[in-house]
């Protein structure tokens, strides 16, 4: 963490840090708006099965957050504590996005369960260290607020863009739940590696504060 509380982080650095939020929120919105009708109406899974799977995964997600947070805090590598999680978790997340958002023509509940588990786990592997990294960039309260605010801007933009995908597709004469999920999936698969790569390249990761 930066010790100088009067220091102001470069604007470019802060905006680059916020970029991954654009893709990360695009993962969450389909789970809330589009996933259930896509898998029930397009893929043919029973609504109760989809509901049970998502309920079970959400229960496990309550374990994922503190688990990955604790491991990330304690991790020590020459690349830092947060970087490895964004790299490994981001790669797994991209594979999960590909399979969950663009599945084969025929799937069963096992396929859905497996890829939902991997999707939620890998998303947590990225988002928890990512948010922690932002808080560690400075010890200044105002700067932390600025960093979080810019991250929220990207979250808001990603939310609006993702929720508006069906409308955007209609402007090009394309419609349907499959097209919507594919468009969002491709968006994440393009934006996530580029934005994470920029963060790894341009945003410093302060060393952890030694405990007394």
Kindly label every feature range from the protein language model.
Residues 2-212:
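Membrane-embedded alpha-helical bundles of multi-pass transporters/translocases
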């Amino acid at each position: 963490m930066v010790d100088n509380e009067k220091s102001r982080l470069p604007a470019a650095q802060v905006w680059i840090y916020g970029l991954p939020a654009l893709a990360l929120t695009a993962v969450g919105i389909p789970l809330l708006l589009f996933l259930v009708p896509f898998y029930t109406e397009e893929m043919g899974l029973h609504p109760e099965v989809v509901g049970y799977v998502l309920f079970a995964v959400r229960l496990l997600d309550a374990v994922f957050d503190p688990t990955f947070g604790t491991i990330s805090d304690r991790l020590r590598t020459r690349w830092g504590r947060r970087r490895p999680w964004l790299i490994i978790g981001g790669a797994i997340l991209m594979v999960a996005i590909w399979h969950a958002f663009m599945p084969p023509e025929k799937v069963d509940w096992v396929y859905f369960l497996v890829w939902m588990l991997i999707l939620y786990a890998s998303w947590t592997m990225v988002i928890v260290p990512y948010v922690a990294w932002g808080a560690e960039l400075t010890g200044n309260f105002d700067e932390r607020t600025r960093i979080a605010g810019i991250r929220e801007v990207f979250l808001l933009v990603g939310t609006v863009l993702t929720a508006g995908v069906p409308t955007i597709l209609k402007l090009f004469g394309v419609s349907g739940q499959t097209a919507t999920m594919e468009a969002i999936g491709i968006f994440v698969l393009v934006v996530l590696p580029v934005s994470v790569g920029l963060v790894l390249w341009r945003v410093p990761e302060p060393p952890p504060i030694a405990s007394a």
